Amino acid sequence: MAVSVDQTLAGKYPAKLHAKRVAARIQELGHGDSGIIYLEGQKTHMIEDSDGEMPFRQRRNFFYLSGCPLPDSYLTYDIKADKLTIFIPPIDPASVIWSGLPLSVEEALEIYDVDAVLSTAEVNASLAHYCSAQGGKKVFAIADQVSPHITFLPFQEIDFDVLKRAAEESRVVKDSYEIALLRRANEISSKAHVAVFKAAMSARNERELEAIFVGACMSSGCREQSYHPIFASGTNAATLHYQKNDEDLVDSVTGQRRLNMLIDAGAEYRNYCADITRVVPLSGKFSPESRQIYDIVLEMQNSSLAMIKAGVMWEDVHSTSHRVAIRGLLKLGILRGTEEELFEKGISVAFFPHGLGHYLGMDTHDTGGNPNYADKDPKFKYLRLRGPLASGGVVTVEPGIYFCRFIIDPYLSSPDLGKYINADVLGRYWSVGGVRIEDNVVVTDNGYDNLTTAPKLPEEIEKLATEK
C-alpha cells in the first residue's frame, strides 16, 4: 500500500540521513572518514537605512543537514560519532516583548531529526570540546559562510573546499520525504493555476491574476513563492522572465483584448519548490494561431517526456524537442528548408532560445546541473542541465516557442539565415507572444513520475476558463 504525502510529511525531515549522505560523499571525494561538518544558517539582515528586517530565506545546504528554518542558527556533524547537533538562538528578553517566545531547546529536539540541541552561545565551546576529545581533527566548512566570532584554531586542518560540493551533489537525488514535499508544492501550485484559469476572462490586469495565484497558494499553506511569478499577457510572453506583471489586458493602442496569458509560477512548500508554466486564452478560447503553436509545444513536451528515464542524456532530450519544434514550424510554413538543415543551422533557436529544463529542489534552478554557458552551439548554450539523468532527480520539462523580435530580427536580416524563415507567414504569429508548458517530474529507473497536476490539454484549459 502506497504511503500518502500526509503520512510521509507527518514524520521528521530526514536531516540525519542527509548528514550521513554528505559525509559519505566527502569520503568518496578522498577527504577521509572523520572530522566535523560545520554549517551556519542565514543571518537576520536589516533593510538598508531602516530598522526593518529583510525577508528571510534559509541557506539551503544548512537546511538540508538540519531541517531547521530558524535564522541565526548553526550545526555540527561529528562524522565518526554520527552525531548531529544544531545550535539555536537563546531567549532574548528584549525580543520576547516584540516577537514572543522563541523555540526552546526541548521543543527543537522534538521537532528536528538531530541528536542534540544547544544554544548558539555554546558553538565555540562545542568545537573546542570536539578537538580536545578527538585530538584536533579536521573541520569542513564553506569559506564565505563562517561568522567572524567562530574560531577553528584548535583544529589541525580546515577544509573550505569539499563541503559545498559534497552537499550540492548529494542534493541532486531526492529521498521519499523530499519528493513528498515537492509533490505537495506541485499540488498547491497546480490548484492555484486552475484558479487563474477560471479568472482569466474577467481579469483586467496582469497583477490581478498574480494576486489570485499567490492568494490561492497562501490559503493552502505556502507563504512563499519559489521565484518571482511571471504573468505575461500578449506579446509580453515573448520575454522569457518577464517581471512587470502590471499591464492591462486590453491593448491601449488597438483596444483589443490580448490573446493569452503565460503563467510561470510555483509555490514554495517548506523550502521545496514547484516551477510550473501554463498558458490560458484570455477570451476563453485559443485563437487559431495560438492553438497551432500550443499544439507544437505540447508535442515538444510529450516527446521529451517519453524519453525520460535514468541514464538518458539530457542533451538528447533537448535536441529532440528542437526537432519537434522544427517539424511543427515547417508544417505551418514559418520555416523553410529541411529538418536536418534547419537543425544544423540552429534556426530553431530563434524560436526556442532556452534550455529544456533544470534540476528542481530547494532551489528553483537546483544544484547538480553542470551547465556549460561557454558552449558555442546556441542550441545548448543555455541548457542548465547537462549529462545523464539521475534516478531520483527531479527535473523541469519546459519547452517553448516564442515570437520575440529582439531574437528573431537578427535571423531575418542575416544573409545566411534569413532565407529559412518566411517573414510573411511569421507576421501572423507575433501577437501570440510565446507559449511554454512546464511540468516537474521525478526521474525513475524506467521512466518518470509527473508531480504536476495542473491541466495542460487545450480543451481542458478552455473549459476551465469559460466556467461560470
From Swiss-Prot:
E.C. no: 3.4.11.9
GO biological process: proteolysis
SUPFAM superfamilies assigned to the protein according to its UniProt record, in alphabetical order: Creatinase/aminopeptidase, Creatinase/prolidase N-terminal domain
Cofactor(s) this protein cannot do without: Mn(2+)
Keyword Metal-binding attached: yes
Keywords: Aminopeptidase, Hydrolase, Manganese, Metal-binding, Metalloprotease, Protease
Reactions mediated catalytically: Release of any N-terminal amino acid, including proline, that is linked to proline, even from a dipeptide or tripeptide
GO molecular function: manganese ion binding; metalloaminopeptidase activity
Details of cofactor binding: Binds 2 manganese ions per subunit.
One Pfam family linked to the record: AMP_N
Residues annotated to bind Mn(2+) 1: 275, 398, 438
Function: Catalyzes the removal of a penultimate prolyl residue from the N-termini of peptides.
Recorded family membership: Belongs to the peptidase M24B family.
Record protein name field: Probable Xaa-Pro aminopeptidase PEPP
Source organism of the structure: Paracoccidioides lutzii (strain ATCC MYA-826 / Pb01)
